[in-house]
């Protein structure tokens, strides 16, 4: 099946954050014409290959790392720029990046037609193993059980990691279940969860070989 372009650009500006996101669910070339970044960029979450362009700049290093993993293993091209009120804490930046990414995903996906709708995935990282299940249901709901013990990983509060996923699911209008099944290193637990989610999303948005709406209702809206 030949997919439509499945690209989107989202600009979200509040008193707390300024965010720009460009996404292509199919990978390939994307760009942001006018960058909002006024700081020196980090190359830690930047990757350009023949099939993907990924550049994540939220100002929170571990959040960049998680979004990079999500984009990489979903097969997306993704650029995220955020200027947030990090002098307060990481809450608004993390939450708003989740919201903006969910909005961009929903816009890029368009009508849920001709795709599998459901996806699931497992991903290990050393001793950690996570499971994710996704439904492109237009019924936003998230159940996130990561079992994190630390207060922070780098500059990212551990309580904000599930909240990012909840914010993404709400804005994307998808049902999302993510569980870390085992593991003792919180970095590994978190990263395996984002990779499992990527695998699940990649399956859910893949072709089902028809042009049908995958619902007994005949609509997902």
UniProtKB/Swiss-Prot annotation:
SUPFAM superfamilies, A to Z: Ribosomal protein S5 domain 2-like (SSF54211)
Alphabetically ordered keywords of this record: Amino-acid biosynthesis, Histidine biosynthesis, Lyase
Enzyme category, top tier: lyase
One example of a Gene Ontology biological process annotation: L-histidine biosynthetic process
HAMAP family: HisB (MF_00076)
InterPro entries (alphabetical): IGPD_sf, ImidazoleglycerolP_deHydtase, ImidazoleglycerP_deHydtase_CS, Ribosomal_Su5_D2-typ_SF
PROSITE patterns to which the protein is assigned, alphabetical: IGP_DEHYDRATASE_1 (PS00954), IGP_DEHYDRATASE_2 (PS00955)
Catalytic activity field: D-erythro-1-(imidazol-4-yl)glycerol 3-phosphate = 3-(imidazol-4-yl)-2-oxopropyl phosphate + H2O
PANTHER family in the record: IMIDAZOLEGLYCEROL-PHOSPHATE DEHYDRATASE, IMIDAZOLEGLYCEROL-PHOSPHATE DEHYDRATASE HIS7
Family statement drawn from the similarity comment of this UniProt entry: Belongs to the imidazoleglycerol-phosphate dehydratase family.
Protein known as: Imidazoleglycerol-phosphate dehydratase
The UniProt record lists the keyword Chaperone: no
Source organism (scientific name): Kluyveromyces lactis (strain ATCC 8585 / CBS 2359 / DSM 70799 / NBRC 1267 / NRRL Y-1140 / WM37)
Molecular function, one GO term: imidazoleglycerol-phosphate dehydratase activity
Documented EC number(s): 4.2.1.19
Superkingdom per UniProt: Eukaryota
